[in-house]
Amino acid sequence: MKFTYYISSIFLLLAICGFTTSCDVHQFPEKHPFVLHLKYDTELPLYKIIEYDPATRSELSNSYDIRYTVNIYRQNTKTNSDPLYQYVFTKDDISQLNNTITLHLIKGNYRFVVWTDYVNQNSQNDLIYDTYSFNNICLINSEYVGATDLKDCYEGIIESEVSNTIREAVINMQRPVGKYKFISTDIEEFKSKIIATKGINNNTNRSAENIVNLSDYKVYFRYNGYFPTNYNILTSKPIDSKAGIYYISDIRQLNDSEVELGFDYAFVNGTESTLSISFEIHDAENNIIAHSSPINVPIVRGKQTIVKSKFLTSDMSGGVAIIPDYDGEFNFIVK
């Protein structure tokens, strides 16, 4: 397993000047080893299954590393202050996020702020999130990307003294994002519909899989209204959003009856927020073969919402009614 790190020399030099009482290069304060234990709950609990019933970690490839960015501030400083120290570590074993990091710090009281995300293998450069400032973590300014687990990320903050007796701390890392996923439950009906439309004899020896190629179809997901794009780790809140965001997803077979239409991650303000989402399904000739009206999807920090329906064979229209007296998962019905 590869494990590398980088120390920001600018912040390190500033920190030394800040803690010394003079510029006497012969008198540097003694540094003490301090161990940060980063613990991650990588499970993404199911929050709600939203079922539309008119009748009644995709796995990441080995070409990515985990990046740990550790900013260290004076305790009780303003949230817009620059860090005293910055450490950047990477690890190539993305199956295990838990990590132990040893730092060398001068005695004092600190706030440790950690951000964890994915980067390209053997690189520490930003991939999905621009992390130049922890006051303004934002999506990289390029074409918006959805339907990728590379957008999964974690944050953690702890305040601790560093001294002869206090030499370690545990940070429980949490996701600042929630995830949603759209699943269509009518893939067999969809294939039969396409075969009938093409006028293909069902008695041929060709299977439905050979006749209907799911790679010919794309799903355009659109956010109606504003989508949160910028996040402040020090306050744990989204701070900006943009309108007109959409992304394109492939259709992925899950089992004999279900396909995944698409999914995404979003920064959450507080514990729960709502996104208005609509989508169109296009065929190889870019014809729209199915579409939805705006659907209000609850997004919960650190959890996953699954939206299920027969999206491939029926247009969704009308409003969404919530069944009020239901203990547990919520069922949404499109009228």
Where are these regions (language model features)?
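Sec-dependent bacterial lipoprotein signal peptides
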Residues: 1-24
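Structured interaction patches on ligand/partner-binding surfaces of diverse proteins
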Residues: 91-95, 119-168, 247, 285-314
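Conserved "repeat-terminator" motif of extracellular CCP/Sushi domains
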Residues: 170-178, 264-270
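Exposed, polar/acidic Ser/Thr-rich sequence context and nearby capping/turn residues
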Residues: 172, 184-188, 269-273, 278-328
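Tryptophan-paired
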Residues: 60-126, 192-299, 332-335
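Short amphipathic, basic-aromatic surface patches that mediate peripheral association
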Residues: 31-61, 184-207
